[in-house]
Amino acid sequence: MGFHSKTLTCGSLTDPPRGEIERYAVAPLRVYNWPGVGLGGLICNDLWANPGCTPQPDPHLTQQLAGLGARIIFHAVNGGRGGDEWSQVGFQYHEANLRMRARAGKLWIVTADNCAPDHWRCSSPSGVISPDGDWVCRTADQGEEIFVYSIAS
């Protein structure tokens, strides 16, 4: 179908910023057509624009994809995590952003986070969120699971 490159790269808040921001190439957002359904892709911080992870402003990429005709966004996550309080705050921030952005863009969001290390809670929930912002399929917050959900076009 195509290729998506990370759009909102992470980097330190120092001047100059360090991290992905200095190593990753970015490409314009694209929508792929799959028999009458517009599909988009986002990688990790592309979706939630965590202010602690990037010096760039929030470009609202889910809204941009909706404007380009996307109806479903596939979201791949490899978030940082730990057992501390701020990991819990990050989880809540990620979940709220997933739900709010699905609802605002009237989009389906299919999201999957890396589950390792499995002795800690994931950095964000995995599953499927409807255009109403509701979870219609969701995995446990910790450990490895597989999910399947049919989205009617």
Q: Can you describe what each PLM-predicted range is?
A:
Residues 7-10, 141-145:
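A short acidic/small-residue loop/turn micro-motif
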Residues 48-144:
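CN hydrolase (nitrilase-like) catalytic-core segments centered on the catalytic cysteine
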Residues 1-72, 76-77, 86-93, 151-153:
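Active-site catalytic loop in hydrolytic enzyme cores
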Residues 11, 16, 135-136, 146:
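A broad, structure-centric signal for solvent-exposed, well-ordered loop/edge residues
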